[in-house]
């Protein structure tokens, strides 16, 4: 459980996984700064949260713009005075380019330089720059949580998924570096993924029966554990939401659903030269 009033930033909060995580945090009593470029979507969500235990601040922002990061942090600090949790969720999928991209994959030679740059900017640079803006404020108090939504390993290397897969892989590798850089500071960096095709706008029109997909709310139980006191020492891990067993105590569920971040469990680290 959360034992004191926490302040969280959730990016990409107006729909899909971001919306589900925002509502889950609010239900748990966490105050949330909901960030999204979709101002209409933020307003619609804000109209539905009056009965929640937490309060919500809406911040319309485009994370492809470098000026957005400090603006977001300043707005949150002005409203709440601190930041305890950053949830990097904002992202774009290949269905934004080709709605039938599962049936007709986007081959790497078909992508444009502008498309490549946009996916890197939103899916990889955005989480890094958001953390860069937030973490100094966490360092001052010696605690904080950075939680980043990436994607399944299979998606990272899937045929026709260079734009999405590689940009999400870059984000996860970056979060592994964050975990290493932040070791001993009281600030953790972990990755959370659904574990399968999820009913969001990221997937295209040809993804199949949405009722049979994972639903965004699957992310809430592991997220709430990650922001709880019980997860204070947990860092450099990747948690798969579909493997989270909510019937188990949190630590056991985390052990079952977690693996080392960024494939560290399946690759041998290089031997460093002696110093």
Regions found by a protein language model. Name each.
Residues 107-115, 145-170, 175-176, 180-184, ...:
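Catalytic loop of short-chain dehydrogenase/reductase
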Residues 2-33:
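Canonical Rossmann dinucleotide-binding motif of NAD(H)/NADP(H)-dependent dehydrogenases/reductases
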């Amino acid at each position: 459980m959360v034992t004191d009033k926490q302040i969280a930033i959730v990016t990409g909060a107006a729909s899909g996984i971001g919306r589900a995580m925002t509502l889950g945090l609010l239900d748990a009593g966490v105050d949330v700064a909901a960030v999204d470029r979709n101002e209409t979507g933020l307003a619609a969500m804000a109209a539905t949260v009056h009965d929640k235990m937490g309060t919500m601040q809406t911040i319309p922002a485009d994370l492809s713009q470098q000026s957005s990061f400090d603006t977001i942090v300043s707005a949150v600090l002005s409203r709440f005075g601190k930041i305890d949790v950053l949830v990097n969720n904002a992202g774009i999928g290949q269905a934004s380019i080709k709605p039938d991209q599962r049936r007709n994959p986007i081959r790497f030679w078909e992508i444009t330089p502008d498309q490549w740059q946009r996916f890197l900017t939103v899916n990889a640079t955005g989480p890094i720059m958001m953390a860069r803006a937030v973490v100094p404020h966490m360092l001052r108090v010696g605690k904080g949580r950075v939680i980043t939504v990436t994607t399944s390993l299979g998606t990272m290397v899937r045929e026709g998924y260079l734009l999405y897969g590689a940009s999400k892989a870059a984000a996860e590798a970056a979060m592994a570096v964050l975990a290493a850089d932040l070791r001993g500071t009281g600030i953790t960096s972990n990755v959370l993924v659904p574990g399968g095709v999820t009913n969001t706008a990221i997937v295209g029109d040809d993804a199949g029966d949405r009722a049979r997909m994972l639903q965004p709310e699957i992310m809430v139980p592991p997220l709430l554990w990650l922001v709880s006191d019980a997860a204070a020492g947990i860092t450099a891990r990747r948690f798969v939401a579909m493997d989270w067993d909510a019937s188990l105590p949190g630590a056991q569920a985390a052990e079952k659903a977690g693996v080392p971040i960024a494939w560290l469990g399946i690759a041998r680290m290089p031997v460093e030269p002696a110093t």
